[in-house]
UniProtKB/Swiss-Prot annotation:
One Pfam family per UniProt: CASP_dom
Annotated source species: Medicago truncatula (Barrel medic)
Stretches in topological domain Extracellular: 48-72, 129-157
The UniProt record lists the keyword Secreted: no
Oligomeric form and interacting partners: Homodimer and heterodimers.
Domain of life: Eukaryota
Main localisation: membrane
Lipid bilayer topology: Multi-pass membrane protein
Family: Belongs to the Casparian strip membrane proteins (CASP) family.
Protein name as it appears in the record: Casparian strip membrane protein 1
Function as written in the Swiss-Prot or TrEMBL entry: Regulates membrane-cell wall junctions and localized cell wall deposition. Required for establishment of the Casparian strip membrane domain (CSD) and the subsequent formation of Casparian strips, a cell wall modification of the root endodermis that determines an apoplastic barrier between the intraorganismal apoplasm and the extraorganismal apoplasm and prevents lateral diffusion.
């Protein structure tokens, strides 16, 4: 017998270690998907329920700020909701990867869909971030004045929802890297 061959009944340490590492990566993928789903859900709910009325409004004229006044915020809520739904559905495949660590085609599909969802989420967060910046600082050249001094609660909530969305984008990057690492171990 050659020195490198395995006899009947023996298990290669590399194969069992590799399978354990892939299982660990799959469990980490599952956990990160749950956290990202919670972050996108919280961002969508925080932005979607944001509105504020100024207290000095008269019965004829009321000053209010709501998320649906701006299309960028509506896009943000829709994108976060879509990504949250996707993450909930992708948990099924993530569980499959924990059970069967050799599934490669479904991992490739998840990587592609994860990149699409990350792009959608990053686009929505960036569009909303530009509006949040103008709400905080205004643009004197265009005569757009900052509104956050008057609508403080509104601005705090929309800024907080952006943080949750950007956390989800960062988690998507980690999820994609973990999936690619698991595929490369095949």
């Amino acid at each position: 017998m050659k020195g490198g061959s395995i006899e009947l009944g023996e298990v290669s340490k590399n194969a069992s270690t590799n399978k354990g590492v892939k299982r660990g990566l799959s469990i980490m993928d599952f956990i990160l998907r749950i956290i990202a789903g919670v972050a996108t859900l919280a961002s969508a709910v925080a932005m979607g329920t944001t509105d504020e009325r100024l207290p000095f409004a008269t019965s004829f004229v009321q000053f209010r700020a709501e998320y649906d006044d701006l299309p960028s915020f509506v896009f943000f809520v829709l994108a976060n909701s879509i990504v949250c739904g996707y993450l909930a559905l992708s948990l099924i495949l993530s569980i499959l990867h924990i059970v069967r660590s050799t599934a490669v085609k479904s991992r490739i599909l998840l990587i592609v869909l994860d990149m699409v969802m990350m792009g959608l989420l990053a686009a929505a967060a960036s569009a909303a971030a530009s509006i949040v910046y103008i709400a905080h600082y205004g643009n004197t050249q265009a005569n757009w004045f900052p509104i956050c001094q008057q609508y403080n609660s509104f601005c705090e909530r929309i800024s907080g929802s952006l943080i949750g969305s950007y956390i989800a984008v960062a988690l998507f990057i980690i999820i994609i890297l973990l999936s690619q690492s698991a595929i490369s171990r095949n």
